[in-house]
Design a protein with these regions (language model features):
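Catalytic cores of carbohydrate-active enzymes across secretory and cytosolic contexts
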Residues: 1-319
Length: 319
């Protein structure tokens, strides 16, 4: 361990890493555990101390909200809204990667349309997935699979005047995305596994608090630990994602406002400035090694129950 500070997104990640180090290294290296501040642990490995902590990365929510308000009326966003013809917009924005659960998401949308034909012709799902790593065969195959799935669903349910899915591979600027988020009635963020996921936070920040959209979020994203008022889903369960989409589209305004207020408060609580401030504070503490008392100085394997890491209730622990 040659670092002063090692940062992770969640408390569960910290606990997993500490457990790994203790189980894999404690037989060959001398490890001592120190109790530190909330969400932080200090380990001494062969005489060198390293602070390990969770630092949930954030955004600048107020600045992003202003950006969304300004770009709601941008030419591209206005053209999109006009083309919708009054239909609800569902949006997903993800890089091309297996971990984002895009195939599973399209399967869920297929099930939603099959189970809720009252929505046929009344909503459009915009999936923005910029092409990357095209030279890697696995990513090229994934892109082809997504294009095939989107085409199949459009052919199955579409009409001459309506296309259920708009699947695009181009890159859009942050300002355009902010305007699109604000326009969307539902944000679909359903990765199979994700350390945090800033799209979820940007979608929340972009919403009009008087008439906000609804966030559907994978419970396997780090953001889900704080975003308990989102509609949390298992992305592997297409039926549950389809049901959440149906719930989001008919959610009463009062409930949408209450959920958004709670989510936006969390986005503001853990913004990028706090992330930066806590990281630098941890680095300072890690170098000074102040206020740390040895918890296991007798050579015995350290007891994880004494480590000062708070795990959120029902938090998903990534292995």
């Amino acid at each position: 361990m040659q670092y002063d500070v090692v940062g992770f997104q969640t408390d569960g990640d910290v606990q997993n890493f500490v457990r790994y180090l203790i189980s894999e290294c404690n037989q060959t290296q001398k490890i001592r555990v120190f109790e530190a501040a909330d969400r932080h642990v200090t380990l001494e490995v062969n005489g060198r101390k390293t602070l390990i902590g969770s630092f949930p990365v954030g955004i600048e929510p107020r600045a992003f909200a202003r950006l969304a308000r300004r770009n709601e009326g941008s030419p591209l966003v206005k053209n999109l809204v006009a083309s919708l013809g009054g239909r609800n917009l569902v949006i997903g924005v993800d890089r091309l990667d297996y971990s984002k659960g895009l195939i599973q998401r399209l399967d869920a949308f297929d099930i939603f349309l099959a189970n809720h034909n009252e929505w046929l012709g009344k909503l459009t799902y915009l999936q923005i997935t910029p092409t990357n790593r095209a030279e890697i065969p696995e990513y090229s195959e994934l892109q082809q699979a997504l294009e095939s799935a989107a085409g199949r669903i459009n052919g199955k349910y579409g009409e001459v005047s309506w296309t259920p899915i708009r699947y695009v591979n181009r890159v859009y600027s942050r300002s355009v995305l902010a305007g699109l988020y604000r326009t969307a009635r539902v944000g679909l963020v359903t990765p199979l596994r994700d350390g945090m996921n800033l799209v979820a936070k940007e979608y929340v920040a972009a919403q009009d608090p008087d008439d906000p959209g609804v966030l559907i979020l994978s419970r396997f994203a780090g953001a889900a630990i704080d975003f308990r008022r989102a509609l949390l889903v298992n992305p592997y369960d297409a039926e549950s994602v389809a049901s959440a989409l149906a719930q989001a589209l008919v959610m009463p305004l009062e409930e949408r406002r209450a959920r958004h207020e709670a989510l936006y408060a969390k986005v503001c609580e853990y913004d990028v400035n706090r992330w930066q401030r806590e990281f630098l504070t941890a680095l300072r503490r890690g170098r000074e090694h102040e206020s740390f008392q040895s918890d296991s100085s007798n050579g015995e394997p350290p007891n994880l129950d004494t480590i000062g890491v708070r795990i959120a209730p029902n938090a998903e622990i990534e292995n």
